[in-house]
Amino acid sequence: PKFKHKQLKFNEGNVIYSIGDEAKNVYLIHSGHISIRSKHGLELGNLGPGEIFGEVGRVINSPRTVTAKAKTDCIVYEIDWGNLQKKLDEADPVLVAITRGLSLRIGDANELAEKLWLELSVYKSLE
């Protein structure tokens, strides 16, 4: 990556960050796969090489709303938020607003997915 970063290695099952953690940095997957999970364990995403995660909390300036866990052994680049913030500060305000809006919608969609998953689990348990 062209940003200031630190290479991190995680073994399968390692937690990279948990719900409620401060959103300090974002991550770029170099190798392996990362599972993004809700507070009740619903897998909201399965990310692989070249994908970024951890950006939502930074963009909307809130604590982590999901848990990121290594699904396989993996190498990720922890990207310094300061460098990304400079890019956002220099970006077209319309693009920044779109990015923030999309990030908020991702959070809302994750909450809705978990709610529906929990309701489905209750219905299945009644069968």
Predicted regions and their residues:
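Short hydrophobic/aromatic patches on the structural cores and recognition surfaces of FHA
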Residues: 13, 32, 50, 68, ...
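Short alpha-helical scaffold segments that flank and stabilize functional sites
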Residues: 35, 71-73, 112
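Cyclic-nucleotide recognition modules
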Residues: 46-99
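Regulatory nucleotide-sensing modules
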Residues: 1-37
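A small-molecule sensor/coupling module
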Residues: 84-123
